[in-house]
């Protein structure tokens, strides 16, 4: 097994935290979206995925308009429903929640242990370093599902809960893409390296294109926050730093868009998880 010190010796020093720069561009973040600590999930695709996920506990409440209730009863005949007008549903939810006539209150998913997600080392994973905007994280889960990522690794304290606006933006993807929460990302990266993963950090100042950094071995893509990019310590724990080439000259990407490109490239270079497989 290669040590962290030996791995660091093989790459150039980490020159900065921000994913911006002359090649990689600036990963722009959106304004913080609504989040909800009380366990509400809203929006048709997010609710339907939650109701069909066998890993979830039975919902405490299901709110629906009369039209949505008919559709839900056809799919889930025994589901207890509270039929309300659109405005009444909206008053139960955080301001601005686009509920599409349906919402469910359910305990948060427990997630999986890092070792269960990463052992054996196969395919590719995505780690988010303090990406906090629920809309962005939800969109990233959606891309992770589309391109067959094995799972997503989040920091325990500096990441949104997998519900509310995040679940709506993910359109059900949080139910199919396994997620692991860890206290310390740097220690998690050391563990992943010991398991045989190559750690690829996205950083605009890197001279290495992402397609070159992904050499077919199992890989962890590490994305930095919307405003600050990779933190220095996290960058120093990567085997290699890579940038996304932007030949058009417009060097500014939302972090969710950058993650989608990186995940697509990983699916080509490393290989995707089989559709429908969890963990």
Question: Where on the chain are the PLM-derived regions?
Answer:
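Short, hydrophobic beta-strand segments that form beta-sheet elements in well-ordered domains
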Residues: 41, 60-66, 199-203, 221-224
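Structured adenosyl-cofactor binding patch, chiefly the S-adenosyl-L-methionine
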Residues: 48, 146, 168-173, 232-279
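RNA substrate-binding interface of SAM-dependent RNA methyltransferases
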Residues: 120-207
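Short amphipathic alpha-helix with an adjacent loop that forms part of the alpha/beta core around
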Residues: 114-120, 191-193, 211-215
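Active-site/ligand-binding-proximal alpha/beta "capping" segment
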Residues: 200-250, 254-256
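Short, ordered loop/turn segments at secondary-structure junctions
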Residues: 66-69, 86-89, 157-159, 184, ...
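N-terminal positively charged helical leader segments and presequences
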Residues: 1-119, 278-279
